[in-house]
Amino acid sequence: MPHTLPALPYAYDALEPHIDAQTMEIHHTKHHQTYVNGLNAAIEGTEWAEWPVEKLVGAVKQLPESLRGAVTNHGGGHANHSLFWTVMSPQGGGEPHGQLAQAIASQLGGFDAFKEAFTKAALTRFGSGWAWLSVTPQKTLVVESSGNQDSPLMFGNTPIFGLDVWEHAYYLKYQNRRPEYIGAFYNVIDWAEVERRYLEALK
């Protein structure tokens, strides 16, 4: 069955004023759809066509050379955006609680230190890419960034939330003011969903 564009769990205008409706609609229906289409075109008729996108992206280095570029770019784009939509919510913001909050405190020096590190990762990613909070194979948290549509899955880590810092994610509202966009993102993070992903990654 071909990969499909996931429906958003909220309306395009639900994250206003932090992320505008026009950006959300274009980002979802145009950019993400393009990644889905590109991935399907690349793997159609192959033994990997039925693989979940996360498994496919995680195994990209084991794929034939002829497929690696498309799976990295289009598969990575599909996986990254599929996660991105779910870790935002109109009821988002604030700080994490529970086991995730405890892990951030013990492993990353607390929420303020985490926020500083994550903001730096997003700000200093030159050109297009992502900032991530991921879980390593050793089950520890790490703040990292990746270029283009590379995913932490390609390097053995499990992303539990990420911020898209491609210009298409913010330029209509924020133009070149990436720091302002990053600051706005903290107001829509769905920490309950991030913790759910954290606990899943620990299994």
UniProtKB/Swiss-Prot annotation:
It is an enzyme of class 1 (oxidoreductase). GO terms for cellular component: cytoplasm. InterPro entries: Mn/Fe_SOD, Mn/Fe_SOD_BS, Mn/Fe_SOD_C, Mn/Fe_SOD_N, Mn/Fe_SOD_N_sf, SOD_C_sf. Its EC number is 1.15.1.1. It catalyses: 2 superoxide + 2 H(+) = H2O2 + O2. Its cofactor is Mn(2+). Disulfide bonds: none annotated. GO terms for molecular function: metal ion binding; superoxide dismutase activity. Binds 1 Mn(2+) ion per subunit. The keyword Cell cycle does not apply. It holds the Pfam family Sod_Fe_C. Mn(2+) binds at residues 27, 81, 164, 168. Keywords: Manganese, Metal-binding, Oxidoreductase. Homodimer. Belongs to the iron/manganese superoxide dismutase family. Destroys superoxide anion radicals which are normally produced within the cells and which are toxic to biological systems. This is Superoxide dismutase [Mn]. The gene is sodA.
